[in-house]
């Protein structure tokens, strides 16, 4: 065989062998599509933008909608950077875009599309909605948009919101975000500004939050340009996640021979400290720690610089004359006097009241011109003048104390060299850095001169041990490493065990007075002295029988025997003479007595305050920017002011009496009204119920349209000819620019006195003064400015509104047969009867129970108590401890005696049973408010009756509804002190009659003794 033939045979043999080897491998991969190594994997990415255009976004900046415009600039910059490309030379990335914007409604402005021009055109056309915030519904709609796409692409959503919500009708943000993640959608959370609710953003973002939240913002801090870094980081994360999901190696790979063993590498440098983990769930409350040792006395402070003598102040203006005091109610009926002798014939009675005016007569002839009249009385003080000129700048203050060291900021750009500053104090020692890697050995330097001795460094405080972070995700299993070199010396160990006790410290401050509990039995005393002689002993036993004595004398006659039975009835006797007249009988009830009894029974004859023919309309802001708590304060303000105006017209269509209406508004089409002529509003209680039923709308702010609505629906349709019309408008002065600002003066020039109250909103934005003055018909003196909504319910401001709306009240008393003079109460005080209902159940605990009754004693000591039971001012207090349905203990009834209160509290015993608040309320009404004997009212009729509940609300529900109705019938003003974190808010709201402002929440019973809480409680009660 030739050599050429042998080579051909060898090549044919190798080819046959290769085919035999590859056929099984090809059969193994027949079920999967094979991609050659040169092809690129398609990786389509869909990005959906979810934009919050609610009022909480629109009103954060001035002008309104500027923040929404920045968002509309951010997204085009984002879209411009999304280019189709081959990523990592492995996958071919293509992009699709879609989006929606939302408030309390959702509008899809663009479905998913590949055209950038089409998407951006639709984006520029959107306008902010400016209403409530329902983020959960927006995420739900976004998820549905992705579900309608059949393509198996990588899905991302960019949610731009501040994290605040006004409602969750679609199940909540957290649930909808988890549902989206289950569908394979990854959500990025981007903040439009710095005013955000971070926890809400973290609920939206997919885990890990370091990747999908990572402090993404539309604009950098304290800047107006778009944050390019945020865009680049999000796009980089999208590409990386898409690559990991799309790229799958399908080429045939044959493992090569193992390479030679590598050299041992250098020891790596110590890694940087990881970022702190997310805060863990709130743990249970720990046990109280042991009392620490008394600290060493601190160093004496440096004496401060003496201030300069101030300038002599100018003489103050003479104050305006005080307002007339309010007439008090009649005193209670005195004891029945003795019957007096008949009086002499009385003098002729006083002239009776003038009759009703007759019909108007015919117009008479013009009379002669009269003489010039006397000069009129001086008029009322005018409104306060405009503010004076701005004063000269004040003297610079003393330099302040050095503040604590701030956190290390980002490295700034190199600025121009500044002037040489004064030498600063020695800096605080920095944190210990990680150990660096060994550097290259340098050349030996020349010995330098000996330096001066350095200043001793300040000893730093030991830092507190940080919270344990959450465990990170499990990493991939690493290869088995080779044995390492001997490690460097470790850091110092943890703190050693506690040392021995130090020397005794200085004598501590005098402790608080202790509780008067009986102490342990004392030691046995010394032997006493000899006692007094004991009492005479008992009779001894009989002695022996004596000898027989002599016969005695005859005894005295015995007692007569018993009386015999009566005999038979005798015949009737003759008629006797006529008797003398008997004494005169008691006089019957007079008309005075009857009317007094009726007055004491039903209170229908009391004097009442009348403000004349008066129509008052309140226009209150119910938009999202106000907030739920502030809206509740607005309603309380309306109720408190109307309560000061006395009775309201029983017939809304009558020409006399006061009528009240309310308009609450948000965005267009959401206005709600309590009309002036509503037939259901015929008493103060019915008006209060109608106001309490108003619900927070939480939408946009269309103030001009609301004012026009108020005039058309409340004033124009039901106006009375002789009635004075007042309007009180509560707003921050800002409104939606889409509204017609010409309607700001809708109430002007129509014989309506408009008073405007301007208050900042929940974003701490100041009120708009120019708008407020326009609403008040360009009368600045009728504009009241406040910083907080809580100032609305302050007693001083309520007094001011009362004088403004009803400057000349008329006190009308019924014409009774016997009238008494009115007892005028002090203006600075008012009568109040307070009944404390203290929960004595086992949930409270004995220690907390004693803290609670000590709080009651402190309240009694702080309040000005009445001088007697019929005192027309000041306070009386009662206390009821309750447990189960049949366990109620009246510790002390309504009393003004502080000694009686202290003695009763010293003897109180903890029930330690279950809890039933309904039975306790009924028992308090039947045994404290009313007399248990005859059912007469013990609480003073002219006093406010206040129930103070000290409970957590976790109680039995039996008789609760009946008890609430009984409270309403007795006109009880409830106050709830809820202590601890585990409370039943539904029960607390029922006890507070739906008024959240009447519920005081504190973390524990120790807070009862804190001055801040105690002062708030006293101001609320009084």
Curated annotation (Swiss-Prot):
Post-translational modification summary for this protein: Prolines at the third position of the tripeptide repeating unit (G-X-Y) are hydroxylated in some or all of the chains.
Record region (Interruption in collagenous region): 514-519
Pfam families xrefs: Collagen (PF01391), VWA (PF00092)
Residues annotated as glycosylated: 141, 215, 327, 630, 897
Keywords: Cell adhesion, Collagen, Extracellular matrix, Glycoprotein, Hydroxylation, Repeat, Secreted, Signal
Compositionally skewed regions (Basic and acidic residues) per UniProt: 306-318, 363-377
Residue numbers spanned by region Triple-helical region: 256-590
GO terms, biological process: cell adhesion
Signal peptide per UniProt: 1-27
InterPro entries in alphabetical order: Collagen, Collagen-VI/PIF, VWF_A, vWFA_dom_sf
Amino acid composition bias (Gly residues), ranges on this chain: 534-543
Main location per the UniProt record: secreted
Subcellular location: Secreted, Extracellular space, Extracellular matrix
Chain spans, region Disordered: 263-587
Motif (Cell attachment site): 348-350, 366-368, 426-428, 444-446, 465-467, 489-491, 498-500
Composition bias, Low complexity: 287-299, 389-399
Subunit structure of this chain's protein: Trimers composed of three different chains: alpha 1(VI), alpha 2(VI), and alpha 3(VI).
Chain's role: Collagen VI acts as a cell-binding protein.
Entries under PANTHER family matching the protein: VWFA DOMAIN-CONTAINING PROTEIN
Family: Belongs to the type VI collagen family.
Protein name, as recorded: Collagen alpha-2(VI) chain
Species annotation: Gallus gallus (Chicken)
Underlying gene: COL6A2
């Amino acid at each position: 065989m030739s050599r050429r033939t042998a080579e051909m045979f060898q090549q044919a043999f190798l080819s046959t062998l290769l085919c035999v080897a590859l056929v099984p491998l090809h059969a193994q991969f027949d079920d999967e599509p094979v991609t050659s190594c040169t092809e690129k994997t398609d990786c389509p990415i869909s990005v959906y933008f979810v934009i919050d255009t609610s009022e909480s976004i629109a009103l954060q900046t001035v002008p309104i909608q500027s923040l929404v415009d920045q968002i509309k600039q951010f997204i085009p910059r984002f879209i411009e950077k999304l280019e189709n490309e081959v990523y990592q030379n492995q996958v071919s990335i293509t992009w699709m875009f879609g989006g929606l914007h939302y408030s309390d409604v959702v509008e899809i402005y663009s479905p998913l599309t590949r055209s950038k021009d089409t998407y951006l055109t639709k984006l520029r056309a959107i306008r902010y909605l400016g209403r409530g915030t329902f983020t959960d519904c927006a995420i739900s709609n976004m998820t549905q948009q992705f579900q309608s796409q059949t393509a198996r692409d990588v899905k991302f959503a960019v949610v731009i919101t501040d994290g605040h919500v006004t409602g969750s009708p679609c199940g909540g943000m957290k649930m909808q975000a988890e549902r989206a993640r289950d569908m394979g959608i990854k959500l990025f959370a981007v903040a439009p500004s710095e005013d955000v609710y971070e926890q809400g953003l973290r609920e939206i973002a997919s885990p890990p939050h370091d990747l999908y939240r990572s402090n993404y913002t539309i604009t950098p801090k304290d800047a107006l340009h778009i944050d390019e870094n945020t865009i680049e980081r999000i796009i980089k994360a999208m590409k990386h996640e898409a690559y990991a999901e799309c790229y799958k190696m399908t080429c045939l790979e044959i493992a090569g021979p193992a390479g030679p063993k590598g050299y041992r590498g250098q020891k790596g440098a110590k890694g940087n400290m990881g970022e702190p983990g997310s805060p863990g769930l709130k743990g249970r409350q720990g046990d109280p720690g042991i009392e620490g040792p008394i600290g060493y006395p601190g160093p004496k402070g440096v004496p401060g610089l003496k201030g300069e003598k101030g300038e002599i102040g100018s003489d103050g203006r003479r104050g305006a004359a005080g307002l007339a005091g309010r007439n008090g109610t009649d005193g209670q009926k005195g004891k029945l006097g003795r019957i007096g002798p008949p009086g002499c014939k009385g003098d002729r009675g006083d002239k009776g009241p003038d009759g009703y005016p007759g019909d108007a007569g015919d117009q008479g002839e013009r009379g002669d011109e009269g003489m010039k009249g006397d000069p009129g009385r001086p008029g009322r003080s005018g409104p306060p003048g405009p503010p004076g000129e701005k004063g000269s700048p004040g003297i610079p203050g003393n330099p302040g104390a050095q503040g604590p060291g701030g956190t290390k900021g980002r490295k700034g750009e190199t600025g121009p060299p500044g002037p040489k500053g004064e030498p600063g104090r020695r800096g605080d020692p920095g944190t210990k850095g990680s150990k660096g890697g060994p550097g290259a050995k340098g050349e030996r330097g020349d010995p330098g001169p000996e330096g001066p001795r350095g200043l001793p460094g300040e000893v730093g405080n030991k830092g507190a041990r940080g919270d344990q972070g959450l465990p990170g995700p499990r990493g991939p299993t690493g290869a088995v490493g080779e044995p390492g070199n001997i490690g460097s010396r470790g850091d110092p160990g943890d703190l050693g065990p506690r040392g021995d006790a130090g020397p005794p410290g200085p004598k501590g401050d005098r402790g608080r007075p202790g509780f008067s509990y009986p102490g342990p039995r004392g030691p046995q005393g010394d032997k006493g002295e000899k006692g007094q002689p004991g009492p005479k002993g008992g009779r001894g036993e009989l002695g022996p029988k004596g000898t027989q004595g002599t016969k005695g004398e005859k005894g005295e006659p015995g007692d007569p025997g018993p009386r015999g039975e009566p005999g038979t009835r005798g015949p009737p006797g003759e008629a006797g003479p006529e008797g003398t007249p008997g004494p005169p009988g008691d006089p019957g009830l007079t008309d005075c007595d009857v009317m007094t009894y009726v007055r004491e029974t039903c209170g229908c004859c009391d004097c009442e305050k009348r403000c004349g023919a008066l129509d008052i309309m309140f226009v209150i802001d119910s938009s999202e920017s106000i907030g739920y708590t502030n809206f509740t304060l607005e309603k309380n303000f309306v109720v408190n002011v109307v309560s000061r105006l006395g009775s309201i017209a029983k017939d809304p269509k009558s020409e006399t009496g006061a009528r009240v209406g309310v308009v609450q508004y948000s965005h267009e089409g959401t206005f709600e009204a309590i009309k002036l002529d509503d037939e259901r509003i015929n008493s103060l209680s019915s008006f209060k119920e109608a106001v309490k039923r108003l619900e927070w709308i939480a939408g946009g702010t269309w103030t001009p349209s609301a004012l026009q609505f108020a005039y058309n629906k409340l004033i124009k349709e039901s106006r009375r000819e002789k009635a004075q019309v007042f309007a009180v408008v509560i707003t921050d002065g800002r409104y939606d620019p889409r509204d017609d600002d010409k309607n700001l003066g809708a109430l002007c020039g129509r014989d309506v006195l408009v008073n405007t109250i301007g208050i900042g909103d929940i974003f701490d934005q100041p009120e708009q003064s120019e708008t407020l003055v326009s609403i008040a018909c360009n009368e600045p003196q009728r504009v009241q400015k406040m910083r907080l909504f809580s100032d609305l319910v302050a007693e001083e401001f309520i007094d001011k509104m009362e004088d403004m709306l009803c400057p000349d009240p008329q006190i009308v008393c019924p014409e009774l047969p016997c009238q008494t003079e009115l007892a005028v109460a002090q203006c600075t005080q008012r009568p109040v009867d307070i009944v404390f209902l203290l929960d004595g159940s086992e949930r409270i605990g004995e220690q907390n129970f004693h803290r609670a009754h000590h709080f009651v004693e402190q309240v009694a000591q702080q309040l000005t108590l009445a001088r007697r039971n019929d005192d027309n001012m000041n306070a009386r207090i009662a206390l009821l401890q309750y447990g189960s349905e049949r366990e109620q203990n009246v510790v002390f009834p309504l009393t003004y005696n502080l000694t009686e209160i202290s003695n009763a509290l010293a003897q109180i015993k903890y029930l330690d049973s279950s809890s039933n608040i309904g039975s306790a309320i009924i028992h308090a009404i039947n045994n404290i408010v009313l007399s248990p004997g005859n059912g007469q009212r013990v609480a003073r009729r002219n006093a406010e009756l206040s129930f103070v509940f000290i409970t957590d609300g976790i109680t039995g529900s039996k008789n609760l509804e009946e008890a609430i109705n009984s409270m309403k019938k007795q006109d009880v003003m409830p106050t709830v002190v809820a202590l601890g974190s585990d409370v039943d808010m539904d029960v607390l709201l029922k006890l507070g009659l739906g008024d959240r402002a009447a519920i005081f929440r504190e973390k524990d019973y120790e807070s009862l003794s804190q001055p801040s809480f105690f002062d708030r409680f006293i101001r609320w009660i009084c």
